[in-house]
Amino acid sequence: MPILSKLNKRVRARVEEDDFEHFSQESASDGSELGEEDEEETDDSDGSTSESDDGSGRDGDESENEDLESDSASDANSDITSSLNNISFGALAKAQASLGKRKRSTTLTADIASKRPKGPSRSPPAPSSKEDQKYPNATKPPQKLSHRTSKHAPTIQSSRHAVTRKRTVIENPAIPQARDPRFDSVVLNHSTNGNPSIATNATIHASKNYAFLNSYRTEELSQLRKRLQNLQREKSKDTHDEREIERLKRQITSMSDRMRTFERKEMEREVLAGHRRKEREAIREGKKSQPWFLKKGDVKREVVTRRFTEMSGKEKQRALERRRKKIASKEKKEMPWARRGVE
């Protein structure tokens, strides 16, 4: 077979061979062959025109010749396909090695160009924004994280945030908290032989156990007031005395407020205890099936009424005046600045 014999030949590529000359020679040889075929066709066509007047017999001969030519062409194609099927891979490798790099690159580029869709060539867009100029080689510029809707919303963090490589080997010790044994439920639980009612109401039982401290506080408060009165009577313009007077005033107000809060809490406990006692008696007598629990607002209202009934005339006036000033200052804070100066 001619193709196998050609492929099995040892072919050595020329080093200084120019591809352009090779292709030009091939094209020239192809052109000469095509020219000869064209001349033959023209001769045939001239002969056919001259013989067209002879009759229908010659037309039949021409059709038979065309059939013979088509049969010969099909036989040649079948021979080529059969020879190509029998080619070994070694022969194909040798043929590929014999071809130059330029020929292979040109054929590859021609194949790629033929496969590409025909249309207007699109050049890559020039970097217009700052992000494109900052990241020219990146496929997608980094997206900026959106801001939070409010300061209470959770913060947004990128998943590409690098994790810290520092590791806490020894954690900081916990900050020790001050624990007063007078108000500690653990201490009271051990001291009362494990009575759960005392452990839960530790502050109540601690206040009962240390009720004598209130008498000490009242005595100290009276001594501070006497000392303040003595300093104010002297009316000295010494800066040291003025500072001492201010310090005593602050200390007296803080102690009096603390005593007032203790009294209010004690009164709240008395109100709750009296209400629970009444509810238990009503359930025991059958007047009620379930107890009624007071709310915090009801307890506070009951405490205010008790304090107001126990006050004297002057104390009531002072309390009402303080209440009025408190409400007025609250309303003034809610008032706009334009109206505050008028009133």
UniProtKB/Swiss-Prot annotation:
Subcellular locations according to the entry: Nucleus, Nucleolus
GO cellular component: 90S preribosome; nucleolus
Signal sequence interval, chain numbering: none
Compositional bias per record (Basic and acidic residues), positions renumbered to this chain: 310-320, 328-343
Coiled-coil portions: 214-266
Family: Belongs to the RRP36 family.
Species lineage: Eukaryota, Fungi, Dikarya, Ascomycota, Pezizomycotina
Gene name as annotated: RRP36
Pfam family, one: RRP36
Subunit details: Associates with 90S and pre-40S pre-ribosomal particles.
Gene Ontology BP term (one): maturation of SSU-rRNA from tricistronic rRNA transcript (SSU-rRNA, 5.8S rRNA, LSU-rRNA)
Full protein name: rRNA biogenesis protein RRP36
Annotated segments matching region Disordered: 1-82, 94-181, 310-343
Keywords attached to this entry: Coiled coil, Nucleus, Ribonucleoprotein, Ribosome biogenesis, rRNA processing
Role of this protein: Component of the 90S pre-ribosome involved in the maturation of rRNAs. Required for early cleavages of the pre-RNAs in the 40S ribosomal subunit maturation pathway.
UniProt biased composition (Acidic residues): 33-54, 61-72
